[in-house]
């Protein structure tokens, strides 16, 4: 009996001594078979949203350095690089950017922004922001859109906010009230433009863009655009491209463009009757895909295309003639290589299991596909030389 007691004591002490060790979840390396091409782009991070409530947001990495003969894809690298982080990245990854050689990840339902080194993906900071959505940067400041209130469908929701963060100290330094359920935001000149959706307030959607003067950090005004705004991107002509998701069962989705008038005030010029779920602007080309529910067919209608941002013309209704693009179940993210114009499409599949990343050459020919985490949605290229701002 005494020997059994001593043996049990020894086992308990051993377990106690080990429990503080970090349990490392190793990333999975997959050879895509694609040929590497050396350029100033050395890699691409991909943020998998993970289904809401599952805490399965993960970060993948595509090695484009050219140090190997073929391109390698690494799944779930954040957990491996940061084994002591509780719950890893969290619940619903909603945006991903690189600024000042740091990787910024907006984790929506975990109410936080995670910051890591862009080269090694080591965690630097966690910034608490309620129901955060998207992020934009101007010099030493980050601007994060936030629904503020809880995740719930109700016409009685509070106005959203934009939080201002010092990128050197990771501290919130200010915030400002905008419209209902603000989504993407972008900067042109000294103005911050915020697309307000009102997505929780069905059927009383918001239909405005908030214009914020960055010097004073004050909202100058709101301009009417359309119901349920989402994407907001700027091109090199200082035009804004803003998507409206419509009302789903009435007003159709459209893409609006805005440009400065003679007084420099941003005004709505016109729209194109296309659904845009995501887009990527490279030069004069706006690549997009749209996923729109059809109440006639009772299924999603998927479309692709390219718009010339200078002429405002839809120049093609496809990105590729390859049969592989037809195999995509649910396109959820798109990114175009700004150097070679090859592009990547993220397929969310059924939302609850692994998605896929598909790579196409600039001419649309299919190259390779790999499995990702759940709901691949946001990607950013890592450059060989990232700009460093004043410290």
What is the predicted role of each segment?
Residues 1-6:
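Positively charged n-region of N-terminal signal peptides that target proteins for export
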